[in-house]
Amino acid sequence: SLDRYADGSFDAVFSNSVIEHVGAPAGAEAMAAEVRRLSSRYYVQTPNRWFPIEPHYLFPGFQFLPVWAKAWLLRHLPLAWVGRIADPEEAERVAREVQLMGAADLHRLVPEATVERERILGLTKSIIAVR
């Protein structure tokens, strides 16, 4: 928690690939509110939900699967940084952890920001709210 800091305590707030890990929608809304409270200038980047390869697991379309399918894949395949997860409960927890968002979702959280797009081969890889 950043409660110990007064409103406007920072010249700028920088967040790179964090907001998708804090729990959607409530956690993401709370984080966006904290960013906006701490500074009028900020940079909030997150991977784009609509990019074909999920960046945390390096698996095509992983973000579109139901939790049970994500957990199954996590238990049976060594995906990116997590490897293979033997424990079913841990696999389900990890499957729920990342909640990617699209540009409209990010803009809804910080409506006064400009939403930029980082592209690779013409596809939007990540989205960035800048103010």
Where are these regions (language model features)?
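Short hydrophobic/aromatic beta-strand or adjacent loop that forms the aromatic wall/cage
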Residues: 98, 122-128
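Conserved S-adenosyl-L-methionine
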Residues: 112-123
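A general structural signal for short secondary-structure junctions and capping/turn motifs
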Residues: 35, 107, 118-119
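Conserved SAM-binding loop
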Residues: 1-51, 127-131
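Short, glycine-/aromatic-enriched active-site segment of Class I SAM-dependent methyltransferases
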Residues: 60, 79-93
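Conserved class I S-adenosyl-L-methionine
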Residues: 34, 41-73
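Short alpha-helix
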Residues: 92-114
